Amino acid sequence: MKKVVPLFYLGILGVFVMVSCQQTASDAGKTTVAGDSAATKKDPLPSWNDPLKKEIIDYVSKVTTEGTPDFVPVKDRIATFDNDGTLWAEIPLVQELFAYYRVKQIVTANPALAKKQPFLAVVTKDKAYFEKGGEKALIQLVGATHTGMTEESFEKDAKEFFASAVYPGRNVPISKIVYQPQLELLSYLRASGFTTYIVTGGTIELVRAISDSLYGIPKNQVVGTTFKYVYVDSNRSIMREPAIDLLCDKAGKPVGIQMHIGQKPIFSAGNERSGGDIEMCKFCQSNHYPSFQLIVNHNDSLREYYYQEKDSASLKAAVQNKWHIISMKDDWKTIFPR
């Protein structure tokens, strides 16, 4: 099978001069996750509009009502959410910002590396280097910025990045580019006995660093793109090697779900941009229990961004398979936390 490089690295040169990392207020790395007691409120999804809001609530009520044909036991109430473009904004992708952060960090510590590839191409914004080098050059960059360190070191760097990073174009902390309606949905599902997972094309460790603080999802409930690991006995740690073990995108998402979760979800949410969530939604729909699929349509240029896939693959798949499409413009009363 032909290897594919995750899309979040393709635009790194475009954001090289946009990213600003500065120290923000002490709560910059935090966001307000709606409490899981939200389901006990009269309105568990206050940022959602009908009819989609009602359809979600009706589904949850159906599968959680004991004694009915559609009842799903708590152990089987698995919900999987994509991250980029589904739980937070993706223009630019946070993974791109982190890759730049790491390049800057590395060349500051060792200036001589700024004259060597792939760092030279990033520093000089040499787009042709990556276009000509293709997959090999991109994997080289990924390996150089995301591996060669212990898991503890990587997590420390990731948390420092999230504590200081400012999102380009909006001048807000990363915690402020999460989607408020989705925070409510996550809390509502958990309060209804669901276990919520993130299934992301992004690197698993980067998302694990903030999944709990941003979404109330513990790190052991994050599935994502992974590098190969090796155990180092001398310091009893796990080192990351510059080779991708699982690309958790498209057909890789069901594989990741099976590897980490071990069963099909009954609820899944993704978004349109690259067709990366189609297979996850299909996998979810094949569950023998009643299931529910959501695809976020980025059609609100005023409050977020407007972009579509060239072939509209995700939206076409949603229509064909009778999944639910979230119109950001029409279905969400608000988009970002206030």
Question: What is each of the regions a protein language model found here?
Answer:
Residues 1-9:
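Bacterial N-terminal signal peptides that target proteins for export
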Residues 17-20:
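C-terminal motif of bacterial Sec signal peptides marking the signal peptidase cleavage site
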Residues 25-47, 61, 76, 155-338:
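C-terminal cap/substrate-recognition subdomain and adjoining C-terminal extension
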Residues 40-82:
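Mature N-terminal segment immediately following signal peptide/propeptide cleavage
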Residues 66-73, 91, 110-116, 196-201, ...:
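Surface-exposed patches in mature extracellular/periplasmic domains of secreted proteins
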Residues 77-92, 281:
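Asp-based phosphoryl-transfer active-site loop
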Residues 93-94, 98-176, 180:
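A metal-dependent, Asp-based hydrolase signature
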